[in-house]
């Protein structure tokens, strides 16, 4: 982005995740970057700035429903870090302003259908202005993308590559994440935007390599065909990891993001796979301890069956954290994530790796 008054402005800074992101940025990088904070509530914003030792002049009150005010704030910085969700409700004005003004943008959304729509609407504008719009930069889907990329690099050209991930996690959900989940259940998603390759089709590679033109179309690498790995969406005991397992709750997000990244890398010539499959499961306990498996199965079935009903969402909202709330600091510090990933190609080559992070996966490890 062009020379601006700030390098980074954190939008949604007074939310649960926003506060943590702002604190980390200011503590670690304020000597190297000019950092500002933006949020809707002036009093809470000034209180946060005081806690972090940030001058009041570096704080900006902004309501994302006010498009003109959003443009003013976006125009002050080279990069917007948005933690203000649900993004389907509050995010479009920010993305639109960044795309138009050439301001780089990143967020921690897991709303695939929303980002697909945003890419369709604003990718061309972002390419023209020089803005880079980068989503899914939290727990969904940074660990998955890192692991898949590291494993895929070990393989040469293959007819097929299958990668399967197993998550062991300990952590809590904050109110913003739950609000996003409830909003997603309420909307039911947008059926035309939930295909496994939706982010590939929507992106058209604008943010990575520019549009495919008539001049280079004949030499463009063929993108991998998506296949369903054996054992995807499995409920039961998995011999490979000797654990009970269910589908991972964020697999619907991560699989689509991973396929987009895989396709982009293949477009750039990094990989050469004709078919590619990716799936995610939760790792929930040894054979003699099925309790967490049973509880997780019941939870997933309950959300699937009752989630579309307004009365259930209203009831559920009484028992979960509200936006701005989240796990205690002690709980966050005690959290962890371990990701075991297995890859197998059609030629018989097998590879695996393990990623591990200390701290709550959503509220420390990836913030």
What do these predicted ranges mean?
Residues 38-42, 63-64:
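N-terminal Rossmann-fold cofactor-binding loop
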């Amino acid at each position: 982005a062009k020379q601006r008054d700030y390098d980074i402005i954190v939008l949604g800074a007074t939310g649960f995740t926003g506060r943590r992101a702002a604190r980390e940025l200011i503590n670690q990088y304020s000597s190297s970057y000019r950092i500002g904070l933006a949020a809707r509530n002036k009093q809470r914003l000034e209180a946060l700035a005081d806690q972090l030792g940030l001058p009041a002049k570096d704080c900006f009150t902004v309501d994302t429903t006010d498009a003109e005010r959003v443009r003013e704030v976006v125009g002050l910085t080279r990069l917007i870090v948005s933690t203000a969700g649900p993004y389907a409700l509050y995010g479009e004005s920010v993305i639109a302003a960044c795309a138009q003004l050439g301001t780089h943008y990143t967020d921690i959304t897991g709303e695939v259908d929303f980002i697909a729509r945003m890419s369709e609407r604003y990718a061309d504008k972002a390419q023209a202005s020089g803005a880079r719009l980068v989503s899914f930069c939290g727990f969904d889907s940074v660990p998955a993308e890192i692991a898949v990329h590291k494993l895929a690099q070990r393989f040469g050209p293959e007819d097929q590559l299958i990668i399967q991930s197993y998550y062991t996690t300990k952590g809590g959900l904050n109110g913003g994440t739950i609000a996003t989940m409830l909003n997603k259940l309420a909307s039911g998603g947008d059926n035309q935007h939930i295909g496994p390759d939706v982010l590939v089709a929507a992106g058209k590679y604008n943010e990575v390599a520019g549009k495919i033109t008539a001049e280079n179309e004949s030499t463009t690498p063929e993108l991998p065909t998506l296949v369903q790995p054996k054992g995807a969406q499995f409920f039961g005991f998995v011999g490979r990891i000797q654990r009970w397992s269910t589908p991972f709750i964020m697999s619907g997000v991560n699989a689509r993001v991973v396929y987009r990244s895989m396709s982009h890398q293949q477009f750039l010539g990094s990989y050469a796979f004709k078919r590619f499959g990716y799936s995610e499961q939760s790792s929930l306990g040894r054979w003699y301890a099925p309790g967490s498996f049973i509880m997780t199965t019941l939870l997933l079935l309950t959300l699937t069956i009752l989630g579309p009903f307004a009365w259930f969402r209203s009831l559920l909202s009484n028992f979960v954290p509200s936006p701005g709330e989240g796990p205690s600091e002690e709980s966050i510090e005690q959290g962890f994530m371990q990701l075991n990933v297995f890859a197998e190609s059609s030629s018989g080559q097998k590879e695996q790796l393990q990623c591990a992070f200390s701290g709550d996966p959503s509220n420390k490890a990836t913030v």
